[in-house]
Amino acid sequence: MKKFVKYFLYGLIYLAIIFFLAVMFIATAKADLVKPNNSIEPYQVVKIQLRSLKQNDKPTKNNGIEQTWEFAHPNNQKNTGPLDRFKLMIKGKSYEMLLNHLDHQVVLINSEELVVLFEVTVLDKTKTYYKFNWQVEKYTKNGPLKDCWLTTMVSSPTPLSSSI
């Protein structure tokens, strides 16, 4: 009986160690970014970007900006990149209201075969509303991004009003 109790306790200790290590790994693992694929629709692209920017530093610092970069059209990346420069641009006066905003709405304005335009309204953390035009295009060149919807343009923000 003593051997049974002894091995039972060893088993419990072993399971506790495995559980502890699993929790530590999950807590420290960097979240994988959603990669563009041809099954993600234009509206979803904009929502993925906005949800990520809404919680920019979760689970890691600048994760939202990095997620947004993933869905930037290669031509847009050439104009706004590399990634470190893109991060500075988003954190600058023109787009800082997107970071850690409180709420957003996305409304379809125009949809064509290869280009879709949305009006995005964002409520920033100071409770001011801003409006953007957000355009996505279907990538037509061969390669891993073929037929993926990617952001080609986000307008400068137009301040609307305070929510208070």
Task: Indicate where each model-derived feature is located.
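Bacterial N-terminal signal peptides
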Residues: 12-23
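N-terminal Sec-pathway targeting helices
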Residues: 2-14
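Boundary at the C-terminal end of the N-terminal hydrophobic targeting segment
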Residues: 29-31
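Short solvent-exposed beta->alpha transition segments
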Residues: 59-113
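Exposed beta-sheet edge and beta->alpha loop/turn motif
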Residues: 108-164
